[in-house]
Amino acid sequence: MVDINQIPTRRPFHRRRKTCPFSGANAPKIDYKDVRLLQRYISERGKIVPSRITAVSQKKQRELAKAIKRARFLGLLPYVVR
């Protein structure tokens, strides 16, 4: 019979949490006119990339989404990329 205490247990895998790229001392400001910065947070299809992928905090993700939508409305960013 196998003793449960003799079976080696795996150590739990802890993924290191990424920090928000917009928080910190020299972090860039989110501005709707900064098209190059906003394009990094848009997929190749033109959709806003979720914060679980980009590691942006919830507050900054809302600011980012608002800036992207504002830039789209003004014609600085495309709505859809084909």
Curated annotation (Swiss-Prot):
GO cellular component terms given for this protein: cytosolic small ribosomal subunit
Stretch list, region Disordered: 1-20
Domain of life: Bacteria
Alphabetical list of InterPro entries matching this protein: Ribosomal_bS18, Ribosomal_bS18_CS, Ribosomal_bS18_sf
UniProtKB keywords: Ribonucleoprotein, Ribosomal protein, RNA-binding, rRNA-binding
Disulfide-bonded cysteines: none
Listed GO biological process terms: translation
Quaternary organization: Part of the 30S ribosomal subunit. Forms a tight heterodimer with protein bS6.
Protein name: Small ribosomal subunit protein bS18
Organism: Mesorhizobium japonicum (strain LMG 29417 / CECT 9101 / MAFF 303099) (Mesorhizobium loti (strain MAFF 303099))
